[in-house]
Structure formats: C-alpha cells, structure tokens
Amino acid sequence: PQDTAIVVNPNDPASPRGSDYLYDISVVSEVKLSISHDDWNTFLTNFDLNPDNNTYIPATFSFKKGSESFQIDSVGVRLRGNTSRRRPEGATGELHQSQNANWHHVHFQVKFDEYRDKVKFCNSDRVVLKWFKDDAMYCREVYSYDLFRRFGVWTAPRASYTRVSIDIKGDSKPAYFGVYALVEGVSEAFLANRKAAGKLTSKNGNLWKASWGATLSPNSMSDDKMGVSVTSLNPSESVNYVYDLKTNKKTGLNAARTQLNDFVNTMNGLASGSSALKTFLETRMDVDQFLRAYAVNVMVGMWDDYWHGQNNYYFYFDENNKFYFIPFDYDNTLGTSIGMNAGTQNMLTWGSLDNDRVLMRKVMSITEYKERYKNYIKELASADNDYFYTDKSLARIQQWHTMISPYLANDTGAEMMLNAVPAGWGNISVYCVLRGKVTG
C-alpha cells in the first residue's frame, strides 16, 4: 500500500501513538538518517579528533512502520558506546566515499530536541540505535528488556527491532546498516513518560548515570567522582565522572551531591537487618522495583551490572528524595560473560555483599526482602509463567528470528546471519542461545 504521511503537530508528529507504538516488539520498523555530505565528513573527522566525543551533527530522521511514515528535520545524531565505539566509515583520515564505501556497524544516538526545543517522537526525546555487537543471535538486549517489562520492571528502558539506513545526500542510494535494536533513551522524557503513566510522582528530580566504580558506598561518594561529564572534541578538555548527573545540571549539582551522599551515608549507618533500616528503605526507595529488577538481572546472567561489576545503571531521586534503580545496557547476557560463570553463580551472592556494595548488602540483610527476591526468581523460572522458562523464552526468540531474518544482509558485510555462538572474548564458550550445554 502507498505510504501515508501523518503530521499531528510540529513538536511530535507521532504523539498520539506513544511509546507502545515506537517500541512495538512484534514488528520491524525502519529508520533512515539523512545527512549532508559535509556533515557526515565532519562526523568522521570528529571521531578522528576524539573517538569518545559526544558531538552531534544534524540529520533528518525518518521512521516507517507498516503503511505509516513520519519525518523530523534537524535532529541530532552522535555515536554511542564505550569499547564498541568505532568509525562508521573508512579508516582514520579518510572522508566519505560515494562509491564502494567501507561501512562499519556503530551505535547511534538520535536526539530529537538537540537543535529545536521540545521536539519529540512518540513522546521520546531520544532513541538509541544499537547494532548487535558480540550477539550473533540478535536477541540478548531485546530479550532482556522485554523480560523486564513482562515482569513489571517499569524502570527499565524499552526496546524493539528496527532496520537502519544512512542516506548521505548526493549518493545514489542509502547505505543499509541492517537490523538494529531501537532502545529507549534514559532522559527527562523517560521520566516524564513514567510520571504520565502514574509510576513516578515527579519528573524533575535528579537522574544519574553510574559507570564503573559506582558502588553506592561512602568511599565512592567524593566530589571528584560526582559531577556533570563533558566529552569534547579535545580529549584534554573532557572530564568523566563515576556518577554523572543527567538532569538539573546547570544549577543543581551541589544539591544533587548532597542528596546522594545523604541517601548512602544514612543507609550505611543503620544496622543491617534492623527495623530502622527497613523503615528507611521502605520510605526512601522503591524496594520492590529493585528486587524485581535484580531477579531479572541475575536470570539473564548480567555480570557487568551494579552488584557484580559496579557498572552500567542509572538511578533517579524524585522530588520527595525517593530512590529508583534503573537497569541499563543488557547486550552482554544469556551466556556472554567474563569474570564469572553466569550459569552457575549463586544468585544470593551474585556479587559483593560487603562494604563495596552498601545498597545490595543492606537490602539483602532484610529477611523479607531476600525471600521476596528468591520468590521472584522462582516466578521467573516457573513453567506456568511466560517469563524465563526455557520453552517460553525459546518460542519468543525464534519468533523474533523469523521476523528479522529477511533483513540481516547489509552493506557493512558484517553480522549477516544468525549464529549460535557467544562473544569470542567470553569465558564460557558452551553457553549458546538455542543450543549448548547446561553448565560450563
């Protein structure tokens, strides 16, 4: 059928659809980023100056789902990732080649309001386009975020499948980058959507991104570890913090630091297992969301997390000082691990329970919480529920494979087929999605 361009309002052409439409896991949408020749060359040159830079370039964002199509001009596009970052085309110093370009899979972030205020798409202010690095089964991150949602973890981002094309204006045709994960960005709009759904009471609190070393322990709370990260084109001008404040950045840093210190130090000072600690946790954090999130976390074998890896999560304090844990970055799961055996690790001692992980140590010291966590693991594993149980999980993954398989071949020449092998750097090679041994 002929495409139907739908425009509802200039700030969000798909606002009536909402996030359920954008992160619909039952279909493969299409995303095209149209970028001028000069801006793409700037993108490549910026990478050469500093591969870690977060500098945006302008683009036109096009989204197609079924017979509906949408377009937003003047969005911002940048690279994402840590160890996964690389040049999207060619080698160092090379500019764009209109013929026989050497394309590379990369992660992109699209920010709809980078150049124009209040612009959104399906109520989101940004989306992350992630290639399936080290996941030849094209399922790990999508599966994990879907499982969070099924199990009621509304603090987790959402994800779906999409087909990504990069259209360098003037080229004979767009470059097809293949199937990507379309992941919800954790941002102000992320908070606003959850407030609108009645999950949060406020959207204007302090949102933090936690990176390696973020133990949520007093010894990680110094001011030189809490700040607003800046990643510029000049590496010497860049500064990164373990705890990176993402909201209220202009005037609220000192208050946010005080709030975080107060939460950690007060919790740390209360006796483990005590009624005073339980009262504090009940009033100052969403304990149930945390327990549900961690039951899913260990079931999918996420080792590069808060508990084991002191890494890869967000957290949010609402305007009533209540703490919410936000799981994040679940591509290294389902058997892809290092530093632990994710298939046999004790789920009650997934990571440290000493002074290096005060939050986990304190929560697990409350018998009621530990038992609830254990019961959640049982719920996830039960054959009666459509959660983690083997047959139920495999059916979902196989359905997704049927859906995406026709679209895997792409112009990078890489990751062109499904292959049941874990990441080459992983420590347990027998853990393979859809096949493999039970233990490593």
What annotation goes with each model-predicted range?
Residues D20-L22, S26-V28, D39, Q99, ...:
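Middle-to-C-terminal accessory/interaction subdomains
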Residues Q2-A293, G424-G440:
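Phosphate-handling architecture centered on phosphoinositide signaling
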